[in-house]
């Protein structure tokens, strides 16, 4: 078995008709493949969009609504209808499904993050298939994850999946938009995600990318940095899920980081909210970036913001003003500033176990998406 634990993400277009309504036929195609993989011994998670599409017609809307309240109401109705369809199909094959609705707050709060990961682990151990969506009905725009590509990558990283498969209506990442550029070539294997890759996907003001591809590159970055390989492939092929599971998919494959980030480091890098800024001298910069050591109080050159003990802060080089990483502090800002003023600044400020260096890929996540 090439990949045992797999997260599949299907977008709204993969399970709806051209008029935006839910397609039971498309859902059945997906669940039949999931059932076959489940019976073959794979552990599966499905991240599925489509709640609004499933619900807007039942509320009497003639087309997909655009107002936030209308979309949230449609999602409230549609999520149940969507789960009903998935549950009925999977249960006919003797498979238990579970609904999990997540929001950005579930990742930002460390305890909730750990609890969600624990629940998912139990479900997979008990051979259930978790079906996950963002909690659209209660999420406010400013606090949303924003897209299920990102959510699927966060889940894949959280449970240390063996593979993330992003199913879409295009068979991978191209050098240009294949719908308008006949010279566009698909990239079958991507080893490093950089500015050029982002531009191909439609970032940095580019007009070359295809709709939705940029969020998939963001998702691939999160997953690959966490040690999870990623496929972007078309959901239109009848055996797309099975082919991806055996590393035979017709799509773009993203090679993961050789040593993926542990769960604690993932949380620091991608989800923890920075409460302040700390500037360090050259000696501390070298110790953090080159030697993998803890940040000592004696290396601090300046503090900005108000934070408490065990809050996350961003650490910058005093010389270059560039971010070096993020970490959880052992002193609040007030206590640290008092120690610095008294010239009794001794001890560890950020332990190396609570520190993550900002790699070029993580820097792209912070600046480009």
UniProtKB/Swiss-Prot annotation:
InterPro entries for this protein: AceGlu_kinase-like_sf, Asp/Glu/Uridylate_kinase, G5K_ProB, Glu/AcGlu_kinase, Glu_5kinase, Glu_5kinase/COase_Synthase, Glutamate_5-kinase_CS, PUA
Domain PUA: 275-355
Keyword tags: Amino-acid biosynthesis, ATP-binding, Cytoplasm, Kinase, Nucleotide-binding, Proline biosynthesis, Transferase
GO molecular function, one term: glutamate 5-kinase activity
Main location: cytoplasm
Chain sites annotated for binding substrate: 49, 136, 148
Matches recorded under HAMAP family: ProB
Protein family according to the UniProt entry: Belongs to the glutamate 5-kinase family.
Protein name (database record): Glutamate 5-kinase
Species of the source: Neisseria meningitidis serogroup B (strain ATCC BAA-335 / MC58)
